[in-house]
Swiss-Prot record:
Gene3D superfamilies registered for this protein in UniProt: Classic Zinc Finger (3.30.160.60), DNA breaking-rejoining enzymes (1.10.4020.10)
GO terms, molecular function: DNA-binding transcription factor activity, RNA polymerase II-specific; RNA polymerase II cis-regulatory region sequence-specific DNA binding; sequence-specific double-stranded DNA binding; zinc ion binding
Function, as annotated: May function as a transcription factor. May be involved in the development of multiple embryonic organs.
Organism this protein belongs to: Homo sapiens
Protein name as annotated: Zinc finger and SCAN domain-containing protein 31
One cellular component term from this protein's GO annotations in UniProt: nucleus
Segment forming the signal sequence: none
UniProt key word Nucleotide-binding: no
Subcellular location: Nucleus
Plastid found in the keyword field: no
Chief location category: nucleus
Family in the record: Belongs to the krueppel C2H2-type zinc-finger protein family.
Domain of life: Eukaryota
């Protein structure tokens, strides 16, 4: 009986002989690209694609074997693959996409990619032009949120993992708050784009424990309610940051903003030592340890630990799509979906196959294309059992049995 590796090679040959595939299927790359394709097929395998549970389990075993290749990998190498995958999983979504594009082959390589990004965004020479300062500052703070205080004992490992899982879920695009607004900018570099949904916000007003000198206290007392209302109505921004020139309508927001430049994080979690520049961020972070989910959807009962998570979830019920494409008018539920859609107009193809070099606008296109190299054909004809890599090819084939003209 042929070994699994031989079966894998035979499967590739079969795909290459299939007339459906074009000439790109004859290109073979390094092991990592094929390994990544097998990993994705294993992780995204659907139960509905098999006749029953026994077939599903058998198919999962086969896909897992193709991914981990125990016949050629040691136990340590297999463990490293699993740890690497989990590390990428706990990263915030947009940062995860950025790291995956670098195709790290180990956990250390993945960490190096994240650290390089942190360093580049923290260097003054890599900041955006003056009109983009506000967004670049937020990005810098976002990267700082990814740093976890190192502890020598294994006891601290689980809280940190839980914390990173939570932050990957609750961080999102920095929106208008307390008189400060960040304008949309479609010209941001890709390194900034990947982090644009990672700023942590809450419903409640920000509460600060700020040590203010006597001069500032006197100034606050002299500010009348009418002056504040006038500033809000006219959009006047009287409080200017001396570091980057960004202006704010409220002095309290300016003080908080200045922590981006100073790196001050006065609010520290007593559980894991993670520090934050905002008290509200600390309060929401604590829920990663307690498991508390106070924000519940009235429609379906689903609960969330962060208010912004509930806000985005509600759009599923209301049908709200606040992010609209300025070119064609198509609207989207999430800003990340809008960014991906806009590549259709710009022609940008950021998802590239490591096997043959072919590029795609969307990640879904790349995932489907990977089946060319792995030989995966998950769609089976119920009439003749012929297999296909695409659902559209299966539907086209089924017309042969129905007599319908293709």
């Amino acid at each position: 009986m042929a070994s699994t590796e031989e079966q894998y090679d035979l499967k590739i040959v079969k795909v290459e002989e299939d007339p459906i595939w074009d000439q790109e299927t004859h290109l073979r790359g390094n092991n990592f690209s094929g390994q990544e394709a097998s990993r994705q097929l294993f992780r995204q395998f659907c139960y509905q694609e098999t006749p029953g549970p026994r077939e599903a389990l058998s198919r999962l075993r086969e896909l897992c074997h193709q991914w981990l290749r125990p016949e050629i990998h040691t136990k340590e190498q297999i463990l490293e693959l699993l740890v690497l995958e989990q590390f990428l999983t706990i990263l915030p979504e947009e940062l995860q996409a950025w790291v995956r594009e670098h195709h790290p082959e180990s956990g250390e390589e993945a960490v190096a990619v994240v650290e390089d990004l942190e360093q580049e965004l923290s260097e003054p020479g890599n900041q955006a032009p003056d009109h983009e300062h506000g967004h670049s500052e937020v990005l810098l703070e976002d990267v700082e949120h990814l740093k976890v205080k190192q502890e020598p004992t294994d006891i601290q490992l689980q809280p940190m993992v839980t914390q990173l899982r939570y932050e990957s879920f609750c961080l999102h695009q920095f929106q208008e708050q307390d008189g400060e607004s960040i304008p949309e900018n479609q010209e941001l570099a890709s390194k900034q784009e990947i982090l644009k949904e990672m700023e942590h916000l809450g419903d409640s007003k920000l509460q600060r424990d700020v040590s203010l000198d006597s001069k500032y206290r006197e100034t606050c007392k002299r500010d009348s309610k009418a002056e504040k209302q006038q500033a809000h109505s006219t959009g006047e921004r009287r409080h200017r940051c001396n570091e980057c020139g960004k202006s704010f309508t409220k002095s309290s927001v300016l003080i908080e903003h200045q922590r981006i430049h100073t790196g001050e994080k006065p609010y520290e979690c007593e559980e894991c030592g993670k520090a934050f520049s905002r008290r509200s961020s600390l309060n929401e972070h604590r829920r990663s340890h307690t498991g508390e989910k106070p924000y519940q959807c009235k429609e379906c009962g689903k609960a969330f630990s962060a208010s912004n998570g509930l806000t985005r979830h509600r759009r599923i019920h209301t049908g709200e799509k606040p992010y609209e494409c300025k070119v064609c008018g198509k609207a989207f539920l999430l800003s990340s979906c809008l960014v991906q859609h806009q590549r259709i107009h710009t022609g940008e193809k950021r998802y590239q196959c490591r096997e043959c070099g072919k590029a795609f606008i969307q990640n879904a296109g790349l995932f489907q294309h990977l089946r060319v190299h792995t030989g995966e054909k998950p769609y089976q004809c119920s009439q003749c059992s012929k297999l296909f890599s695409k659902r559209t090819l299966l539907k086209k084939h089924q017309k042969i049995h129905t007599g319908e003209r293709p």
